[in-house]
């Protein structure tokens, strides 16, 4: 039996008592980097919204998006209508979200373990992205 719960988006985020007891798994795959700040920030905003709704959220950064894990980028980048990267990142990190950062893309762009230090993040290879996608209930790509 499948039960669908609907929350009217015009009423703001669902309160804790309105959330379904089942927590879904959400994967947000971001490939847009500092060259596309609105799209990059939108990916993190959607991940944050998923966390606010009570879902388990994983974010996989690949391609140019690996640069988003750097503090200088987090602190300086905002999207048009999608907010500050730092605010969304901090909310995700504080809420138990986890970041996977493409090891191959990182190597090509000079992102190192030092850039991940103190963050809920780890370097990952493409097979991890495939595993996350098959484990997720829903996947969004930005």
Regions of interest found by a model, annotated:
Residues 109-131, 135, 140:
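C-terminal structural segments of small proteins and small subunits
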Residues 4-22:
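Short, Lys/Arg-enriched N-terminal segments with co-localized hydrophobic residues
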Residues 40-53, 59:
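Histidine-anchored nucleotide/phosphate-binding helix
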Residues 65-79:
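N-terminal beta-loop-helix "entrance" segment that forms/cooperates
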Residues 75-80, 116-120:
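Short, flexible loop segments at the rims of nucleotide/cofactor-binding pockets, characterized by
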Residues 57-62, 99-103:
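Short internal beta-strands
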Residues 26-41, 73:
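Short, glycine-rich nucleotide/cofactor-binding loops
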Residues 76-103:
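A glycine-rich helix N-cap at a beta->alpha junction
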């Amino acid at each position: 039996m499948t039960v669908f719960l609907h929350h009217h988006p015009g009423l703001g985020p669902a309160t804790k008592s309105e959330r379904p007891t089942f927590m879904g798994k959400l994967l947000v795959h971001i490939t847009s980097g500092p060259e596309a700040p609105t799209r990059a920030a939108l990916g993190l905003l959607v991940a944050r919204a998923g966390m606010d709704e009570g879902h388990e959220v994983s974010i996989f950064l690949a391609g140019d998006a690996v640069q988003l894990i750097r503090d200088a980028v987090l602190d300086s980048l905002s999207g048009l209508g999608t907010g500050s990267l730092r605010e969304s990142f901090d909310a995700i990190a504080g809420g138990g979200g986890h970041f996977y950062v493409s090891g191959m893309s990182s190597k090509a762009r000079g992102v190192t373990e030092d850039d991940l230090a103190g963050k809920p993040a780890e370097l990952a290879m493409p097979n991890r992205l495939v595993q996350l996608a098959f484990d997720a209930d829903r996947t969004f790509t930005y």
